[in-house]
Each structure stands twice: as C-alpha cells, then as structure tokens.
Amino acid sequence: MGAALSSQWARLLGEATGDEARGARVVAWHVRAADSDWVSRVWLGAQNDSGLPAPAIAVDGSEGWWVCFALPPQPSARPQAEAVALLRELIRSWLNQGGAGVSDKDAAAWRFACWPNEAPADGVPVPRQVGPDRWSAFVAPDLVPVFAESPWLDCAPGEEGQAALLNKLQPIPAADWGRLLAASAQGASGRALQAAGDGEAPAASASTALQGDPRAFLLSVMNDPGVELALRIEAARVLLAHG
C-alpha cells in the first residue's frame, strides 16, 4: 500500500519497536458474519452510550468483521490485557442494552487482535489479501448490511478510500479511558465483595470506595485481590501520576 494508508496506520500505531510495541494501540474485536447486526449496535453504543469516538469497521476477508478501537496515545502501547478486558466489558454492555443477552461465557469466547503487537511486518493490518479474490477492507457503517453474508471484497480496495475511512478513527481520549477503567474497577470490586460474602477485608474495601474519596478508592482497588490484575495495575498508575 502507498503513503496515504501507511501514514494513517503510523498515526495510530506509532513507530515503537521492541518492548514499546508489545501491547495495544488499536484493538480490533472480531464479529462472526452470523452476528453482523452486532457491528452497528456496537458502533452506535460506543458513541451514544459511552461518548467515545466511532470505531472503524472492516470486513475481515473471510468469516466476519473487525470493529476497531484506537486507544489513548501515550509513549508506549497500553497493556494488552487491560485494553481487551475493558473493551470486552464495554462491548457486552452495549449489546445487552439492546437486548442481546450476552453471557459472561459468551463474551469470554470473543476474539480480539491487538496492534501493533499482532500487526503484520508492513504495519498495515487492513486492507490485506487473505485468499483468492478475498480482501479485508474498511467499509462505511451504512454498508454493513451489504456485506453481512459475504464479508470480503473481491479485489483490492482503493487506497485513498481506505485512508479516508481510517482517518475517521480517532483515539479514545485519555480522560474517557481513565473514567471507564475506574468504573470497571469499581464494578469489579463490588462483584468481589458480593462473592466474598461477609469477609472483613472486602467489606472494608467497598466501604472506603463508597465514601467518595478518589485516592482511597484507588488504593482499595489496587489492594483488592478480587479485582483483575490489569485494573489493579491501572489504579497504581493513576496514583503514581497524581501523587
């Protein structure tokens, strides 16, 4: 691919190498063709329910879709586990608000790709030729029904059109990402308390969180073994950043 498309991917993925590239700057959620109606639901849910930039939509060239989210820019890629865990939770929430009835088990089986960690050597995950007369490509949201039964292009897409679609993918603001992480951590802490029953340590943690002290809440998340490790790490990062 030429300069226009490569520059758009460079904007999103950066030029980090080695350890700095081992993580996520763009996370793509894979959707089966049979669940094509989910693509539009999530595209709308990200914007209307959570106030996030619109994700990019791509046919994968074989069996379904990629719904792509650009993460907040920072010197190094975000931890892959953190990014996938939060987006998995958000996507399930958006779908279930529309009555999809996605269970924890269903969501756990979803497939995600994290770029640049899993990106091809040329740094261009989409579009690509994935088989004879089968190409992955970005598509406009209103074209999702057109590709529902055949999620591919028969020939290489035009570079300028692909670059224009990718140009619309903007990173999630850092403040919004932090807000969503904190909400997820608080929910996880509450679930841990419920699972623990009358245990004194979780009860103390939840009590502190409910008092409305942000620093105390972050400390409780960081020290709560019932919270996912990625969220505990994020709480520690926020504490270090703000003193």
Positions of PLM-derived features:
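Charged, helical or coil segments that form electrostatic protein-protein
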Residues: 195-234, 239-243
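Generic detector of isolated residues embedded in canonical secondary-structure elements
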Residues: 64-66, 234
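DNA replication initiation modules
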Residues: 22-34, 75-199
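Signature for HUH/AEP ssDNA processing cores
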Residues: 1-63, 70-89
